């Protein structure tokens, strides 16, 4: 099983609460049909941030 490497989001849009945040598409192992799950992870200055109130 090959879990995809983290990569920049292809079409992240913007982070309303933190406009300068960086989006990373990150995947981890999971118990589903694919063997992994992926999510958009927003960070700013090394800290994970939320984009929606």
UniProtKB/Swiss-Prot annotation:
> What are the annotated disulfide bridges?
9-23, 15-51, 27-38
Please state what the protein is called: Metallocarboxypeptidase inhibitor
Q: Does the keyword Metal-binding apply?
A: yes
From which source organism is this entry? Nerita peloronta (Bleeding tooth)
User: Which InterPro entries does this UniProt record tie to the protein?
Assistant: MCP_Inhibitor_Domain_sf
What functional role does this protein have?
Answer: Metallocarboxypeptidase inhibitor. Has an inhibitory effect on bovine carboxypeptidase CPA1 and porcine carboxypeptidase CPB1. Unable to inhibit proteases from other mechanistic classes, such as porcine pancreatic elastase, bovine pancreatic trypsin and chymotrypsin, as well as subtilisin A from Bacillus licheniformis and papain from Carica papaya. Exhibits antiplasmodial activity against Plasmodium falciparum in an in vitro culture, reducing parasitaemia mainly by inhibiting the later stages of the parasite's intraerythrocytic cycle. Does not have cytotoxic effects on human fibroblasts.
Q: How does it assemble?
A: Monomer.
The domain of life is Eukaryota
Q: What is the lineage of its organism?
A: Eukaryota, Metazoa, Spiralia, Lophotrochozoa, Mollusca
Which positions does UniProt annotate for Zn(2+) binding? 53
Q: Which UniProt keywords apply?
A: Disulfide bond, Metal-binding, Metalloenzyme inhibitor, Metalloprotease inhibitor, Protease inhibitor, Zinc
User: Is this entry keyworded Zinc?
Assistant: yes
Q: Which GO terms label this protein's molecular function in UniProt?
A: metal ion binding; peptidase inhibitor activity
């Amino acid at each position: 099983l090959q879990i995809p490497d983290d990569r920049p989001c292809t079409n992240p849009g913007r982070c309303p609460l933190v406009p300068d945040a960086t989006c990373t598409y990150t995947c981890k192992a999971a118990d589903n049909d694919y063997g992994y799950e992926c999510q958009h992870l927003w960070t700013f200055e090394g800290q994970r941030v939320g984009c929606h109130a």
